């Protein structure tokens, strides 16, 4: 693959991986108040051919769930407690911001490679 093609492929796989990461962060934020919900985390791994990255398996954060005291809640046990989620909104917002910035960086790289390819085609056309 040409250097420009490799650049486009790397940037595209980076954007796809960050979009996937942002989707999981969004799910975590949406379920922050869901009783018994465990935060989802993903990791990144390099593609075998070295042309980009992909997201690894989704894992559940096994950190202890928050115990909430609300005797009137339908899920409360005999002591009046139930399990909340282990989602920390500050962490999720920070992860979302990082994923957004990484996506934007890959988008700029993709756009630069596209512009370089277009310039090359314009030169060759003359």
Where are the model-predicted features located?
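Amphipathic alpha-helical polymerization modules
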Residues: 1-126
